[in-house]
């Protein structure tokens, strides 16, 4: 509960009891207040116990090729996007290290825009990049943002997520990475400016301009809207790397109109049509983003463009098995903890990939497919000591048969079948 001065009704520090007139600052928290003197005392205690943290530096920045090689361990395909990201991130942190030493040339910030369909790996690339560099990372959804003063989330709340990711170490957060997803959803409805207020489209783009370029932002520590009696966290966004991503559905048509070429094989040849659309996507330019509905000032603060392609069946199968944190490996490990071996046949993996393509969910849908199929297995195995091995076949994925349970006595059990000798 808040503490009040009974005579004057003033707010008081919840720790030492001093009123706001007796201290220089009174910082508001969720239901409590703390004065600057108590903050200083707490800070001294923490520093004595933990020691002063070293200044955040990036002296040993991985080279672009090293970054790409690490990304290969976690993300399948998308080599073009990996190269663009690796170079941009390397240059960004090299620029931070240069600091103010280059008096003759000012090194500009290189924020990144990623264009690619749902489930192509945009979020995973950004997450992996932050893990490679060991920097704070935050994800935001552009569709939840609105212009200040309207119902929704202020853009400053994105910065709060980054500060929270850095355990409220502002200096560390100032060198972090923010990924804003669904950026295409805040495109204005037409290329021409509207006379009506677009609070979740162009208004949000305008609000994002300053933090993308670099400014000292005031962030409410409790989140939500700014209100009186609230002390703000000051954070400099100059060295924060912003990566924005979106599907930009239909941008191929914008590119096609610009280059004046038709999509070849649009008829029945699905493969040619998709390959040609991906080729068009690879040719996307900043002017195409403007035609799509992003304002020129916003595009200008995203100088690096990386395009991702739709994942085919082969790539989805590799995603299931090859990365260090591959889904199949995770489930194999999960059953291994119950002393049971799990095996997916090659045909089963292909069926999972086909189902993800059919659902148009890309790599993002792989986990939900396996979760659905593994539910009965994960429910049954812990309660049975006689199961030695579980085999998932293509018929398991298509629903024609259940998983095969190889028992410790050598027999095989399958849903709907009688026991048979292995």
From Swiss-Prot:
Keywords: ATP-binding, Chaperone, Metal-binding, Nucleotide-binding, Zinc. Residues 1-54 form the ClpX-type ZB domain. One of its GO terms (cellular component) is HslUV protease complex. GO terms for biological process: cell division; proteolysis involved in protein catabolic process. CDD domains: RecA-like_ClpX. ATP binds at residues 117-124. SMART domains: AAA, ClpB_D2-small, zf-C4_ClpX. GO terms for molecular function: ATP binding; ATP hydrolysis activity; ATP-dependent protein folding chaperone; protein dimerization activity; unfolded protein binding; zinc ion binding. Zn(2+) binds at residues 13, 16, 35, 38. It comes from the Bacteria. InterPro entries: AAA+_ATPase, ATP-dep_Clp_protease_ClpX, ATPase_AAA_core, Clp_ATPase_C, Clp_protease_ATP-bd_su_ClpX, ClpX_bact, P-loop_NTPase, Znf_CppX_C4. SUPFAM superfamilies: Glucocorticoid receptor-like (DNA-binding domain), P-loop containing nucleoside triphosphate hydrolases. Belongs to the ClpX chaperone family. Component of the ClpX-ClpP complex. Forms a hexameric ring that, in the presence of ATP, binds to fourteen ClpP subunits assembled into a disk-like structure with a central cavity, resembling the structure of eukaryotic proteasomes. NCBIfam families: clpX, PRK05342.1. ATP-dependent specificity component of the Clp protease. It directs the protease to specific substrates. Can perform chaperone functions in the absence of ClpP. This is ATP-dependent Clp protease ATP-binding subunit ClpX. It comes from Exiguobacterium sp. (strain ATCC BAA-1283 / AT1b).
């Amino acid at each position: 509960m808040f503490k009040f001065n009974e005579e004057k009704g003033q707010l008081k520090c919840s720790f030492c009891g001093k009123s706001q007139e007796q201290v220089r600052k009174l910082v508001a928290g969720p239901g409590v207040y703390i004065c600057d003197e108590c903050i200083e005392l707490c800070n001294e205690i923490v520093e004595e116990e933990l020691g002063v943290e070293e200044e955040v530096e990036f002296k040993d920045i991985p080279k672009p090729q090293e970054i790409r090689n690490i990304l290969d361990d976690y993300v399948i395909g998308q080599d073009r996007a990996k190269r663009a990201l690796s170079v941009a991130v390397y240059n960004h942190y090299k620029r931070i290290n240069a600091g103010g030493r280059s008096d003759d040339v000012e090194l500009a910030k290189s924020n990144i825009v990623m264009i690619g369909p749902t489930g192509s790996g945009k979020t995973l690339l950004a997450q992996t990049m932050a893990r490679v560099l060991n920097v704070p990372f935050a994800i935001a959804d552009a569709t939840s943002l609105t212009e200040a003063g309207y119902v929704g989330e202020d853009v400053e709340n994105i910065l709060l997520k980054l500060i929270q990711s850095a355990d409220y170490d502002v200096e560390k957060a100032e060198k972090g990475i923010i990924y804003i997803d669904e950026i295409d959803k805040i495109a204005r409805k037409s290329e021409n400016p509207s006379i009506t207020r677009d609070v979740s489209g162009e208004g949000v783009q305008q609000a994002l301009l300053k933090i993308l370029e670099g400014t000292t932002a005031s962030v409410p520590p409790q989140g939500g809207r700014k209100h009186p009696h609230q002390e703000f966290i000051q954070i400099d966004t100059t060295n924060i790397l912003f990566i924005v991503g979106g599907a930009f559905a239909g941008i191929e048509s914008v590119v096609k109109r610009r280059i004046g070429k038709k999509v070849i094989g649009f008829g029945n040849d699905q493969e040619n049509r998709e390959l040609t659309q991906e080729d068009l996507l690879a040719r996307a330019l900043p002017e195409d983003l403007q035609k799509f509905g992003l304002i020129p000032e916003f595009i200008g603060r995203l100088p690096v463009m990386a395009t991702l392609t739709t994942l085919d069946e082969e790539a989805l199968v590799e995603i299931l098995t090859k990365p260090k944190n591959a889904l199949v490996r995770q489930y194999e490990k999960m059953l291994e903890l119950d002393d049971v071996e799990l095996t997916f046949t090659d045909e089963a993996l292909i069926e999972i990939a086909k189902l993800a393509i059919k659902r148009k969910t890309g790599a993002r849908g792989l986990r939900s497919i396996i979760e659905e199929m593994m539910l009965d297995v994960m429910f049954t195995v812990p309660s049975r000591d006689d199961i030695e091995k579980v085999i998932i076949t293509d018929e398991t994925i298509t629903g024609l048969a259940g998983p095969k349970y190889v028992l410790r006595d050598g027999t095989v059990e399958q849903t709907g079948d009688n026991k048979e000798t292995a």
